[in-house]
Amino acid sequence: MKRFLKRLYRYLFCRKGYGVHSPFVFDLITNVLEERHGYYAYTELKAARLMLQDAAKMKNAVKRQSLSRHECEWLFRLANRFKPCRIIMVGSGAGLIPLSLTSYASGGLHGIALEQDAVMANVARSLLRERATSPVEVRYETYEVSLPKALAEFGHPDCIVLDEITGALSALLRCCAGYIHEDTLLIVRGIDASPEANEAWRTACAFPSATVSIDACTWGIVFFRPGLPRKTFGHVVC
């Protein structure tokens, strides 16, 4: 009930940039997160979601980690605005997270999607093989091993996504801290899943170089751009 009331309040009073005095955040909310313009990529993302449903009959694990239409679309819009070229995803949302974040371009970027579940890794590979327009490599290994390798390979990734990492979120955030630069976009899914996840989210917002952060109920977004206000803004995007 508490989560529902929080979402309802945000939906009624925190949309359309109401009460936001930062030009950067106002533009982000009104022209990216809440944009209603249609994109060709939306058709491809819809087809990918249907492909998942048909292929797996939405088995519990796939259904639980899959993304909604709204989630796919705003992730696409976010990537389309900030154009990340080196993307690391810890968890793949059954392949929909890398697909959504890379569909803005047909080349010139590289994504690494990490999975520590063999079934989810295979689901993501199959989906991306059929639908991805940019190269995304799916790696199957424990996150504690695969994430440091991916971070060292990219050096300073443009986008890091942590997808509902139960129990290990704080440790993985600490692992990422030394690789974040001012243009890095940090996206965390499941910040309201548990008290531990919410505490880890607050830790990310408190990184020394963190500036604007968006608490969107289920998802969190952190920017590290100098000159922006060091503040967390409440919103809801899905």
Language-model regions: role of each:
Residues 1-159, 164-185, 192-238:
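A short alpha-helical cap/connector motif
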